[in-house]
């Protein structure tokens, strides 16, 4: 391509799927490693506008397929000029499956992570930086409960390094709000009504691997100083509809997870033709973190009986 | 319970406290054109920008005396624009010489399921209205001239009636805490709008 920073250019992308929200996406090169910040959408009537950040060379085509937002309604073949605006608006991402990898027999968490990453590297995946997903739990303060007359609910506030300017707030089996990072400031103001559950912060950190159209993130789940488990996230970039690509994702998962391959995530279940969004990924992480929290509690309650 | 006053503290817990400085006034409908004309001359050169917004005010009642207020605003004429959630603190009392009303503000852009989420958190809608008007900018100052419309049927933004025969004029700046020279600039700008409109510091408590 040989594009310099800020140099305008135009590409055509063929429609891949019409109907519904009408956006077409086609993926060509897949290495957005040149940009630190996630990119997205400056959109206006059928033309998506992206701004190339300085220093990003030819792997720009990779970004386009990430960025087309179905909401725009790009009915006809979209034309893109080369201006990518970094944005916090996580509007769309490829179908993603988040699962837990059990720790191998007789090995530590770190050793199992190394086994997995070595397998990925042998497959041909390229390391592309790190990632972090964290989650804090809040519960309705006792003082508010009396007037509401309902059981206290748990609210999870999560962050994903893939979208550094965003904050995700969700209730279990409830709506997931996508907001900007000022939401954290608001939670501080709401201290009297929502209290952070003690020692509840849980996070997963690890490396990102790119393998063709798949983005694999293997992370160590930690609560405080202790490692509690391993998370594996796999995203298939080109597709935004879960039912269209689950079998392909499953095959890929089997190739490196083997017998530990998970079943279809619950978020896929109800809405077969709905467009996948980052909020769905955060719901999967919340479920994973809750599962790991419960596992630890089980181990801890067993000990006195031994 | 409100957070402790964020008076002069620019930073609390790693985040910058933003304050909203506000001056308000109003003009009768028939004076609107001359005001718009003057503003177009004084303000930054830009395409005249109109807006139609639907604002809902939510309250969370706890055992504290005053409920927690959040304002959710969405655009009715710009499809795809994010929803805007705003928290406004109590007006800072104190310096009588300060020319503008100062209060802590937190602005958050959110996805469209904001109202469902707020209900899940325990907030209940107190009232809603539609605001329709013009927006001007001068540097960091924002001047908004708008009319408030009462919503007759809850949730139906097409069926509205004007609340009064006048337009509300607001001059506001959102800046980090501790920058009081901002209110001087605002007062100087407000002087230029006299006698078309008198913008002044109006304490909401005095009206209640």
Curated annotation (Swiss-Prot), chain B:
Residue(s) carrying Phosphoserine: 66
| Protein keywords | Activator, Nucleus, Phosphoprotein, Transcription, Transcription regulation
Main localisation, per the record? nucleus
* GO terms under biological process: positive regulation of transcription initiation by RNA polymerase II
Question: Which molecular function GO terms apply here?
Answer: transcription coregulator activity
Q: State the family it belongs to.
A: Belongs to the Mediator complex subunit 18 family.
Q: Please describe what this protein does.
A: Component of the Mediator complex, a coactivator involved in the regulated transcription of nearly all RNA polymerase II-dependent genes. Mediator functions as a bridge to convey information from gene-specific regulatory proteins to the basal RNA polymerase II transcription machinery. Mediator is recruited to promoters by direct interactions with regulatory proteins and serves as a scaffold for the assembly of a functional preinitiation complex with RNA polymerase II and the general transcription factors.
Put simply, this protein is called Mediator of RNA polymerase II transcription subunit 18
What species is given as this protein's source? Bos taurus (Bovine)
């Amino acid at each position: 391509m040989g594009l310099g920073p800020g140099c305008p250019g135009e590409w055509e992308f063929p429609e891949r799927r019409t109907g519904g929200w009408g956006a077409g996406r086609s993926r060509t090169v897949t290495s957005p490693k040149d940009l630190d910040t996630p990119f997205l959408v400056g959109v206006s009537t059928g033309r998506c506008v992206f701004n190339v950040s300085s220093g990003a060379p030819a792997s720009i085509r990779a970004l386009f397929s990430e960025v087309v937002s179905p909401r725009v309604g790009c009915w006809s073949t979209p034309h893109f000029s080369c201006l990518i605006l970094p944005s916090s608006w996580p509007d769309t991402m490829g179908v993603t499956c988040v699962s837990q990898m059990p720790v191998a027999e007789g090995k530590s968490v770190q050793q199992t992570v190394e086994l997995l990453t070595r397998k990925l590297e042998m497959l041909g995946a390229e390391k592309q930086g790190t990632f972090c997903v964290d989650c804090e739990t809040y519960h309705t303060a006792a003082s508010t409960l009396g007037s509401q007359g309902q059981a206290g609910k748990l609210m999870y506030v999560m962050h994903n390094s893939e979208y550094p300017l965003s904050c995700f707030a969700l209730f279990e089996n409830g709506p997931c709000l996508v907001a900007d990072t000022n939401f954290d400031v608001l939670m501080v103001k709401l201290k009297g009504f929502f209290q952070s559950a003690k020692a509840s912060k849980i996070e997963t950190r690890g490396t990102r691997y790119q393998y063709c159209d798949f983005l694999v993130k293997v992370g160590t789940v930690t609560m405080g100083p202790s490692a509690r488990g391993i998370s594996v996230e796999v995203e298939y970039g080109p597709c935004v509809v879960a039912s269209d690509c689950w079998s392909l994702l499953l095959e890929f998962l089997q190739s490196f997870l083997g017998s530990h391959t998970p079943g279809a995530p619950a978020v896929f279940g109800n809405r077969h033709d709905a467009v996948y969004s980052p909020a769905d990924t955060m719901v999967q992480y919340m479920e994973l973190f809750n599962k790991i929290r419960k596992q630890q509690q089980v181990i801890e309650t067993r000990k006195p009986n031994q | 319970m409100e957070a402790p006053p964020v008076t002069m503290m620019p930073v609390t817990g790693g985040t910058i406290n933003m304050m909203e400085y506000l001056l308000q006034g109003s003009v009768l409908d028939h004076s609107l054109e001359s005001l718009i004309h003057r503003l177009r001359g004084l303000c930054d050169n830009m395409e005249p920008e109109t807006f139609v917004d639907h604002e809902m005010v939510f309250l969370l009642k706890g055992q504290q005396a005053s409920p927690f207020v959040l304002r959710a605003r969405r655009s009715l004429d710009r499809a795809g624009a994010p929803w805007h959630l705003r928290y406004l603190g109590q007006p800072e009392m104190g310096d009588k010489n300060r020319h503008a009303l100062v209060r802590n503000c937190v602005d958050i852009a959110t996805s469209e399921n904001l109202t469902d989420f707020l209900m899940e958190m325990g907030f209940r809608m107190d009232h809603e209205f539609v605001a329709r008007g013009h927006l001007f900018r001068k540097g960091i100052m924002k001047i908004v001239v708008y009319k408030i419309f009462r919503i007759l049927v809850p949730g139906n933004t097409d069926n509205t009636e004007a609340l009064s025969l006048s337009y509300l004029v607001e001059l506001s700046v959102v800046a980090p805490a501790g920058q009081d020279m901002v209110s001087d600039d605002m007062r100087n700008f407000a002087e230029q709008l006299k006698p078309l409109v008198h913008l002044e510091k109006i304490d909401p408590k005095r009206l209640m």
